[in-house]
Amino acid sequence: MADRDRSGIYGGAHATYGQQQQQGGGGRPMGEQVKKGMLHDKGPTASQALTVATLFPLGGLLLVLSGLALTASVVGLAVATPVFLIFSPVLVPAALLIGTAVMGFLTSGALGLGGLSSLTCLANTARQAFQRTPDYVEEARRRMAEAAAQAGHKTAQAGQAIQGRAQEAGTGGGAGAGAGGGGRASS
């Protein structure tokens, strides 16, 4: 212990190689560094895993639709361009070609952005739902404990009342009837 205190941050001349390895850095043993969060000792939470499992297929589907729209617009342009150039004047097919290309790229981008924004929205909703759940569970647990305590208190009061009546009936009831009966007869 004294050697470790004298060794300081860098291990010092008195510290052995093993002591330097245990200290790791900052003069703290490695176990404390792990506890402080320098190394992650647990994986993703259940809510994170559920969020990923739910949102990946949806986002993937929307991104696939985005890719299909892009592919369809490129193939459509490749097929329609020669037909427009052969059977129409030059300006009309050029305008249609540019319009189709712009619409295809805009559709592709819109579907991609829609997929990403829906993933973000669902992820935020899922996180908020899972963060609220423990509060509701804790509130229900507290109410159940209060109800159980109140029921126990009422049961104890009822038991004491019954016990008190039984004692009165056993001891005070016989003496009270004889004394009360004699008082009424003399009046």
Swiss-Prot record:
It comes from Zea mays (Maize). Disulfide bonds: none annotated. Belongs to the oleosin family. Keywords: Acetylation, Lipid droplet, Membrane, Transmembrane, Transmembrane helix. Found in embryonic axis, scutellum, and aleurone layer. One of its GO terms (cellular component) is monolayer-surrounded lipid storage body. Signal peptide: none annotated. Residues 33-42 have a biased composition (Basic and acidic residues). The N-terminus is blocked. The chain crosses the membrane at residues 50-70, 83-103, 104-124. GO terms for biological process: lipid storage; response to freezing; seed oilbody biogenesis. It is a multi-pass membrane protein. This is Oleosin Zm-II. The gene is OLE18. It comes from the Eukaryota. Its main location: other. It holds the Pfam family Oleosin. The modification N-acetylalanine is found at residue 2. Residues 52-123 are annotated as: Hydrophobic. Residues 155-169 have a biased composition (Low complexity). May have a structural role to stabilize the lipid body during desiccation of the seed by preventing coalescence of the oil. Probably interacts with both lipid and phospholipid moieties of lipid bodies. May also provide recognition signals for specific lipase anchorage in lipolysis during seedling growth. Residues 2-51 are annotated as: Polar. It is found in: Lipid droplet; Membrane. Residues 17-42, 155-187 are annotated as: Disordered. Residues 170-187 have a biased composition (Gly residues).
